[in-house]
């Protein structure tokens, strides 16, 4: 079935759908990873975005239940050069088209993804719309123009939990209530995790560090956190513009004075804002598995997994030590507060997908909590 991808600037890409009749709209970005499409599809940080995979052949190892990063597909639409309909992998339980179709996600193939990527790289990420109704392309352009801009858009409410939950090691479980309050499930150092779109591999790696976790909605107040009695606080990744989450920025500005804190991606940006910094939108973002980052504390070069469209302005921060920098564009990738037990990185140490060069971040946070609390 014929399909069209229309960008807000009027650029058109003609292809065909591999998910049947449908439509989708969102910010169009590109991901340079050669593998990991299943993790990309289920990463909550891609909410509101249509992802173009630059690798030309996608879907060859199918879909399996082990490699998902959340309960649902999160991308608004999926764009590939060629979709494999006959995967070959011993873990595969369904094809990529079957997976997308089962959750009502529109996919388009047969377009020149290299040309699309170059266009986005030159002109920046922009709104786009996929439609199988190709009779009036300018109407589809109009639909793209009518979509909200990612700047100023808060999307955490679309992906966060409704109520606190715990992590069993393999699955989410509703937090138990004992004597009128949420009960901690174990005996390790208590960690409140703010959910703005948490990835499951982050929960796995925090569990591996021995943390006893309660994952809470991002709307949880500082007073509610205090009543839970944690030893530390963690801010998750998530989608959208961090500056739109004004209440959470305020909450974070209070918590940094009371607990050891760590943040990843959106959590990193929120900590930057809470400490008086500014954020800005990148031209086309960092989305891929091979971004070089330098750890300024050790001099070590890491190959990192990244997925963000916003960044903290280096010049806007005070009382912090810059710990990581991107070697492609010299943007900020991590910082630590000079006086408070606060650390944050912009990229994804949990990978999923991607290299494991940066997984030390979780043990670094664990050591920070141990130093501050004795636990």
UniProtKB/Swiss-Prot annotation:
Q: Which InterPro entries match?
A: Anth_synth/Amidotransfase, CarbamoylP_synth_ssu, CarbamoylP_synth_ssu_N, CarbP_synth_ssu_N_sf, Class_I_gatase-like, CPSase_GATase1, GATASE
Cite the SUPFAM superfamilies for this sequence: Carbamoyl phosphate synthetase, small subunit N-terminal domain, Class I glutamine amidotransferase-like
Name the keywords, alphabetized: Amino-acid biosynthesis, Arginine biosynthesis, ATP-binding, Glutamine amidotransferase, Ligase, Nucleotide-binding, Pyrimidine biosynthesis
Report the residue ranges that make up the Glutamine amidotransferase type-1 domain in this protein. Answer: 190-375
Q: Which cysteines are joined by disulfide bonds?
A: none
Q: Which is a GO BP term held by this UniProt record?
A: L-arginine biosynthetic process
EC numbers, comma separated: 6.3.5.5
Ranges for region CPSase: 1-186
The record's section on PROSITE patterns has: GATASE_TYPE_1
Q: Which CDD domains match?
A: GATase1_CPSase (cd01744)
Molecular function terms from GO: ATP binding; carbamoyl-phosphate synthase (glutamine-hydrolyzing) activity; glutaminase activity
Query: Record's Pfam families?
Result: CPSase_sm_chain, GATase
Biological pathway: Amino-acid biosynthesis; L-arginine biosynthesis; carbamoyl phosphate from bicarbonate: step 1/1; Pyrimidine metabolism; UMP biosynthesis via de novo pathway; (S)-dihydroorotate from bicarbonate: step 1/3
Q: Where does the source fall among the domains of life?
A: Bacteria
Q: Which residues form the active site?
A: 265, 348, 350
Report whether Ligase shows up as a keyword of the record. yes
Described by its record, this protein's role is as follows: Small subunit of the glutamine-dependent carbamoyl phosphate synthetase (CPSase). CPSase catalyzes the formation of carbamoyl phosphate from the ammonia moiety of glutamine, carbonate, and phosphate donated by ATP, constituting the first step of 2 biosynthetic pathways, one leading to arginine and/or urea and the other to pyrimidine nucleotides. The small subunit (glutamine amidotransferase) binds and cleaves glutamine to supply the large subunit with the substrate ammonia.
Family named by the database record:
Belongs to the CarA family.
Q: How does it assemble?
A: Composed of two chains; the small (or glutamine) chain promotes the hydrolysis of glutamine to ammonia, which is used by the large (or ammonia) chain to synthesize carbamoyl phosphate. Tetramer of heterodimers (alpha,beta)4.
Report the HAMAP family cross-referenced here.
Answer: CPSase_S_chain
Protein known as: Carbamoyl phosphate synthase small chain
Q: Which organism is it from?
A: Solidesulfovibrio magneticus (strain ATCC 700980 / DSM 13731 / RS-1) (Desulfovibrio magneticus)
């Amino acid at each position: 079935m014929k399909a069209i991808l229309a960008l807000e600037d009027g650029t058109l890409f003609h292809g065909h759908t591999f998910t049947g009749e449908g439509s989708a709209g969102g910010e169009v970005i590109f991901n340079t990873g050669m593998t990991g499409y299943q993790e990309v599809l289920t990463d909550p940080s891609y909410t509101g975005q249509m992802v173009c995979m630059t690798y030309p052949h996608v879907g060859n190892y199918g879909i399996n239940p082990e490699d998902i990063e959340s309960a649902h597909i999160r991308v608004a639409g999926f764009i590939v050069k060629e979709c494999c309909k006959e995967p070959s992998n011993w873990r595969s339980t369904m094809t990529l088209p079957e997976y997308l179709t089962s959750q009502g996600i529109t996919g388009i193939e047969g377009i020149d993804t290299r040309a699309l990527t170059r266009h986005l790289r030159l002109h920046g990420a922009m709104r786009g719309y996929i439609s199988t109704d190709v009779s009036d392309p300018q109407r589809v352009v109009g639909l793209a123009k009518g979509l909200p801009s990612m700047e100023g858009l808060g999307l955490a409410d679309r992906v966060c939990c409704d109520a606190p939950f715990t992590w069993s090691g393999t699955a989410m479980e509703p937090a138990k209530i004992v004597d009128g309050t949420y009960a901690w499930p174990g005996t390790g150092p208590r960690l409140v995790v703010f959910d703005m779109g948490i990835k499951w591999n982050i929960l796995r790696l925090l569990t591996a560090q021995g943390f006893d976790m309660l994952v809470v909605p991002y709307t949880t107040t500082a007073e509610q956190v205090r009543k839970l009695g944690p030893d530390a606080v963690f801010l998750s990744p998530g989608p959208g513009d961090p500056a739109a989450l004004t209440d959470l920025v305020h909450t974070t500005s209070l918590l940094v004075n009371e607990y050891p804190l760590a943040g990843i991606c959106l959590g990193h940006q929120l900590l930057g804002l809470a400490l008086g910094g500014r954020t800005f939108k990148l031209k086309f973002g960092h989305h891929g598995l091979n971004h070089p980052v330098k750890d300024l504390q050790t001099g070590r070069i890491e190959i990192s997994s990244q997925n963000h469209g916003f960044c903290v302005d280096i010049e806007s921060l005070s009382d912090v030590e810059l710990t990581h920098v991107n070697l492609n564009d010299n943007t900020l990738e991590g910082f630590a507060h000079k006086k408070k037990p606060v650390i944050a990185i912009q990229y994804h140490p949990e990978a999923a997908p991607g290299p494991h060069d940066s997984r030390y971040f979780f043990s670094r946070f664990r050591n920070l909590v141990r130093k501050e609390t004795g636990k």
